[in-house]
Regions:
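Conserved sequence/active-site signature of Rossmann-fold short-chain dehydrogenase/reductase
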Residues: 43-45, 57-58, 94
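Cytosolic eukaryotic protein kinase-like domains
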Residues: 3, 59-62
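C-terminal substrate-binding subdomain of Rossmann-fold SDR/epimerase-dehydratase oxidoreductases
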Residues: 61, 67-185
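Residue-level preference for alpha-helix termini and adjacent loops
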Residues: 1, 5, 9-12, 42-43, ...
Length: 185
């Protein structure tokens, strides 16, 4: 993940993660402070903002689709072609991995909290549609850019430190998140 330039669509975010990794190395070298560097894919799940403009991508799509359903809209617009593939991390998986990782004394390398499994934006949109009970059509607005075509994390280091780590099923995580937001939007 340190090879090459960070994709322009995540330039600030990606470079901040790299800077934190280097900062952790400095703390270890200068002050003997051990750190754990966990790298996450896109996260989603209950507890995030109810404002679709201030939340993560998948939660934002869930909120907007629930709003479209309540408004009786016949269409739901997704930006881009729907073809980019993204890996998603349910919030409970992140918390579980973080708690388990704190038991390690020192990790000199970053660990991806990834499954090496992704879903296209279109696939996730259709899962959300099913979970929400939205009866309208999903429309892809191709005047918006897609960003990087595939963002999936490797899992070899996660398997080394937490070989039995179990992830939530993506559709189950979406259903749980829809249930959380149904009464809030």
């Amino acid at each position: 993940w340190l090879d090459g330039d960070v994709h322009e669509s995540v330039f600030s975010f990606g470079n901040s993660k790299r800077a934190l990794y280097y900062l952790a190395g400095c703390y270890k070298q200068e002050h003997q402070i051990s750190t754990v560097n966990l790298l996450l894919p896109n996260t989603y799940g209950p507890g995030d903002s109810t404002d679709p403009n201030k939340t993560h991508a998948l939660n934002g799509m869930i909120i907007r689709m629930l709003q479209a359903k309540k408004a009786g809209d016949s269409q739901f617009v997704v930006w881009g072609t729907g073809s980019p593939v993204r890996e998603w991390c349910y919030v409970d998986d992140f918390v579980d991995a973080m708690v388990q990782a704190t038991s390690f004394e020192d990790m000199e390398y970053p660990v991806n909290i990834g499954q090496e499994k992704g879903y296209s934006i279109a696939e996730s949109a259709h899962m959300i549609k099913k979970a929400c009970g939205f009866e309208g059509e999903i429309v892809f607005d191709t005047k918006y850019p897609d960003g990087d075509p595939v963002k999936i994390l490797g899992k070899s280091k996660l398997n080394d430190i937490l070989p039995n780590f179990e992830f939530f099923d993506h559709e189950e995580g979406i259903r749980n998140t829809v249930k959380y937001y149904e009464d809030k939007v």
